[in-house]
């Protein structure tokens, strides 16, 4: 392949990647506002600045696009948990995980709300992911946390319930953002409130799992 051909291929690849990113971003905005059934592909295409035909070239159906958006959300959420290793200091690792999950709630509130909508609907389009890769990851990390408990590095708690509690307390600030703002007058976009939230959620959870 000539140097010119390589440059052309690289340019085309970047253009495709940018177009997919624009479509996924527009899909997240639209699905989180109108839900799966209330969203039309024409809306997403217009917001992404592409034709419907072009959109369908990359994502063959509304369902395929919706699932791609949800998988992207899961990848963002689960990355910090995937990084857990047995040699980590447990309390420090869990404190950092809480901070990272709150950063996700701050930076991707629409993603959190869309995922919540899918769960409330019974996860009809995401159940394979939940019972497959997600369950495998939770099983793996629960066993790791159970090892920390057994070695006395954490109080005797159930690992799955710990993970659920972290998810619930951190995602609340995105899923119920209007309620949080109505009560406190602030959102996670407020730096002072964000830091207070991190410190309080960390303290409440860490003090509950600290070995006595």
Curated annotation (Swiss-Prot):
GO molecular function terms noted in the UniProt entry: DNA-binding transcription factor activity; transcription cis-regulatory region binding
One BP term from GO: negative regulation of DNA-templated transcription
The entry's keywords: DNA-binding, Repressor, Transcription, Transcription regulation
Pfam family, one: TetR_N
Portion annotated as DNA-binding: 39-58
Domain HTH tetR-type: 17-77
KW Transit peptide (keyword) present: no
Quaternary state and interactors: Homodimer.
Summary of the function given for this chain in its UniProt record: Master transcription regulator which represses the degradation of pyrimidines (rutABCDEFG) and purines (gcl operon) for maintenance of metabolic balance between pyrimidines and purines. It also regulates the synthesis of pyrimidine nucleotides and arginine from glutamine (carAB) and the supply of glutamate (gadABWX).
Record PANTHER family: HTH-TYPE TRANSCRIPTIONAL REGULATOR RUTR
Name of the protein this chain belongs to: HTH-type transcriptional regulator RutR
């Amino acid at each position: 392949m000539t140097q010119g051909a390589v440059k052309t291929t690289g340019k085309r690849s970047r253009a495709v990647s940018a177009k997919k990113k624009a479509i996924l971003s527009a899909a997240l905005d639209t699905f989180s506002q109108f839900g799966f059934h209330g969203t039309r592909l024409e809306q997403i295409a217009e917001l992404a600045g592409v034709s419907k035909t072009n959109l369908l070239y990359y994502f063959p159906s509304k369902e395929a696009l919706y699932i791609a958006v949800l998988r992207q959300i899961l990848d963002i959420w689960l990355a910090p948990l995937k990084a857990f290793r047995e040699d980590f200091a447990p309390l420090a690792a869990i404190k950092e995980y809480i901070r990272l999950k709150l950063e996700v709630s701050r930076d991707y509130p629409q993603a959190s709300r869309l995922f919540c909508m899918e769960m409330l609907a019974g996860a009809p389009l995401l159940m394979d992911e939940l019972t497959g890769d997600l369950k495998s990851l939770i099983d793996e990390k629960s066993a790791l946390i159970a090892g920390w408990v057994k070695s006395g590095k954490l109080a005797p708690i159930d690992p799955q319930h710990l993970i659920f509690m972290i998810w619930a307390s951190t995602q609340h600030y995105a899923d119920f953002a209007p309620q949080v703002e109505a009560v406190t007058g602030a959102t996670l976009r407020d730096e002072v409130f964000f830091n207070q939230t991190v410190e309080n959620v960390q303290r409440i959870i860490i003090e509950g799992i600290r070995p006595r």
